[in-house]
Regions:
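Alpha-helical segment of the N-proximal tetratricopeptide repeat
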Residues: 37-66, 70, 114-133, 137, ...
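Residue-level recognition of tetratricopeptide repeat
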Residues: 40, 74, 145-146, 179, ...
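Canonical positions in the second alpha-helix
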Residues: 66-67, 101-105, 137-138, 171-172, ...
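Structural marker of alpha-solenoid helical repeat scaffolds
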Residues: 70, 105-108, 141-142, 175, ...
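Canonical tetratricopeptide repeat
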Residues: 80, 151-152, 185, 219, ...
Length: 495
């Protein structure tokens, strides 16, 4: 299923065999103990893990909630609900409350479980150094636990360290060849590094292991779409829905595919159908943003403004800070009036500074990309004072959080500013750290062209022409690639 919309709580599914056993597994087995006072709670937990393994998130969360009702001190069940990742099914306030319950129960569980709670809590609250320390300690204590090995690999992947995650997933697959979840993530990692041959081979193994589940078909469809094979992707999305008509993420995938194909009215109709079956207000807002991006693809910026403002208004009513801030940030990205763009970015930052039940790391990461946008806009408009001041603010945020996502935002911002200053070699060093962002890759093309490196410029231009991920950044770059002559509708990012 799409990594951008659904959460990675399936990481805990790897431990379902462990949790079905005794309350605490022997330390000498190298397996993480599990503590709960309720056998029915454990059964619900295990059932939820199986559902998460197959990415049936809302149903899994129902099981976890029932487990917590039976045992409020069930630390791992609580920390699962709070796990800070790309989670469209759990509202921010619920994550915070679940994390607090997990920490309140720490004194009643094993040392290993305490380390897992510390690891995920510190990560969620933006304290990356102690998070890594807890992760390393628990992985060292339980080297045979495939749950922890899997969780570590997914956590690294979530930090945007794809090349580091690949060997971790490969090791997990080698140790447990019949265990499906690592194959899913490994295939995505291969696809994101443009190794589609390995991605397709790995995904075929995943489908073979789970022939009656929707998610393998959904994941295969997304990777086909990433490779530009849109019609084949639609076939597999529909195969997923045939297996489970309620697997709404495949409906979302159909919408994303039509958006990338250029059929924006059809995409909006498909997004509306997905939104109709969304399981949370967060999903409604996030998918509303995706639908609004279709107007950017059509260069109907008035339509985009209206759609983004509608999402921002609804998100504000529902106390969803990140989608509201994203809506303002997205609007800023295509404005031709620099003052208007900066005003929208100021609104986005103000939303994030308000009091919300929001994990600290989530707030920091969204703030980082808002600041990144401000640096790029100011640098492009020749406002070097604002660009430098904002870049300093972003650098301090990266240094204080040790958050890889924030660091990548800083490198993207620094690279953009340096390109505008004509410091191309220095810019390329920073931009290479943000090479999963089409806008940064586009800046790299400019830098290579300016330095006379036509081979690298052409290689990256070809990469951008085949960049098939349904993001705003991709839409902006695609508009530049396909509409160079439409000066009146040019975004400042499309240059």
């Amino acid at each position: 299923m799409p990594r951008n919309y659904f959460f990675r709580l399936a990481v805990f599914a790897v431990c379902c065999g462990v949790f079905a056993a005794a309350e605490t597994a022997p330390r000498e087995q190298g397996i993480l103990p599990i503590t709960t006072k309720s056998a029915p709670a454990r059964q619900l937990f295990v059932g939820g893990l199986v559902k998460l393994q197959n990415l049936h998130g809302p149903e899994a969360l129902q099981d976890f909630h029932k487990a917590i009702q039976l045992d409020p001190d069930f630390a791992l069940a609580n920390i699962m609900i709070s796990f800070e990742s790309v989670d469209a099914a759990v509202d921010p306030a619920e994550k915070v409350a679940a994390r607090e319950r997990a920490n309140a129960a720490k004194s009643k569980v094993s040392r290993g479980e305490q380390l897992v709670v510390d690891w995920l809590t510190n990560s969620s609250e933006g304290r990356m150094v102690p998070a890594i320390q807890s992760m390393n300690e628990v992985l060292e204590q339980y080297p045979k636990d495939k749950f922890l090995a899997w969780l570590g690999a997914v956590w690294v992947e979530n930090q945007q360290q794809i090349t580091r995650a690949i060997p971790m997933f490969e090791r997990e697959v080698a140790l447990n060849p019949d265990f499906a979840p690592p194959l899913n993530e490994l295939a995505y990692c291969y696809a994101r590094t443009r190794n589609f041959d390995k991605a397709f081979t790995t995904m075929q193994r995943y489908i073979t292991l789970l022939p009656n589940e929707s998610n393998p078909q959904d994941s295969y469809a997304e990777i086909l779409r990433m490779a530009g094979r849109f019609d084949e992707a639609l076939v597999h999305y529909r195969a997923s829905l045939k297996i489970d008509p309620g697997f709404v993420y495949s409906q979302l995938g159909i919408a994303d595919t039509y958006a990338l194909k250029g059929d924006e009215p059809r995409a909006r109709a498909e997004y509306a159908l997905a939104i109709l079956h969304a399981s949370s207000k967060t999903e409604v807002a996030t998918w509303g943003l995706q639908s609004a991006i279709t107007y950017v693809r059509e260069q109907d910026f008035a339509g985009a403004d209206a759609a983004f403002r509608a999402v921002a208004s609804q998100a504000h009513e529902n106390d969803l800070a990140v989608p509201e801030a994203e809506a303002y940030r997205f609007m800023a990205s295509y404005q031709t009036d620099g003052a208007k763009a900066l005003d929208l970015l100021k609104k986005a930052e103000a939303v994030l500074q308000e009091k919300h039940s929001l994990p600290k790391s989530t707030q920091q990461q969204e703030l980082a990309v808002v600041l990144r946008e401000r640096v790029a806009r100011a640098a492009h408009d020749g406002n070097n004072e604002l660009a430098n001041a904002t870049l300093k603010q972003l650098h301090e945020l990266a240094d204080s959080t040790h958050n890889q996502v924030v660091q990548i935002a800083y490198d993207g911002a620094a690279g953009a500013a340096l390109v505008e200053q004509g410091k191309y070699d220095e810019a390329l060093t920073h931009l290479a750290e943000d090479n999963r962002n089409p806008i940064s890759v586009n800046f790299m093309v400019r830098a290579y062209q300016k330095t006379g490196d036509k081979a690298h410029a052409d290689e990256l231009s070809q990469l951008l022409a085949n960049w098939n991920e349904p993001t705003l950044e991709q839409a902006l770059v695609a508009a530049e690639l396909h509409a160079h002559t439409n000066e009146s509708a040019r975004s400042f990012m499309r240059m």
